[in-house]
Amino acid sequence: MYQLQFINLVYDTTKLTHLEQTNINLFIGNWSNHQLQKSICIRHGDDTSHNQYHILFIDTAHQRIKFSSFDNEEIIYILDYDDTQHILMQTSSKQGIGTSRPIVYERLV
């Protein structure tokens, strides 16, 4: 059975540059790692009170975003854009102690 994680990125588009918005949009969609049986659904919006995450940092040069949950700000998630079909996701602590190995996700069509 697949583990499914919903990530609702909450941000104010009026405070972001066009390049930052484009960078975020690279990650929007449904992604899966078949080997680990994990799927993630990344979207923009605050139309739900569940699974809300706020963006901490947008690195447009490396196509990377860092974000954390409204419920647990101690865990930081890092998304790296690999290509149109793959992203990498890893976690870290807010204190920077330890970082998980990146998990590769493939875009679901």
Curated annotation (Swiss-Prot):
GO terms for molecular function: cysteine-type endopeptidase inhibitor activity. It is found in: Cytoplasm. Residues 97-101 are annotated as: Binds to staphopain B. InterPro entries: Protease_inh_b-brl_dom (IPR016085), Staphostatin_A/B (IPR037296), Staphostatin_B (IPR015113). The keyword Cytoplasm applies. The keyword Cytoplasm applies. GO terms for cellular component: cytoplasm. Keywords: Cytoplasm, Protease inhibitor, Thiol protease inhibitor, Virulence. Its main location: cytoplasm. Specifically inhibits the cysteine protease staphopain B (SspB) by blocking the active site of the enzyme. Probably required to protect cytoplasmic proteins from being degraded by prematurely activated/folded prostaphopain B. Also involved in growth capacity, viability and bacterial morphology. Inactivated by staphylococcal serine protease (SspA). Forms a stable non-covalent complex with prematurely activated/folded SspB. Belongs to the protease inhibitor I57 (SspC) family. This is Staphostatin B. The lineage of its organism: Bacteria, Bacillati, Bacillota, Bacilli, Bacillales. The gene is sspC.
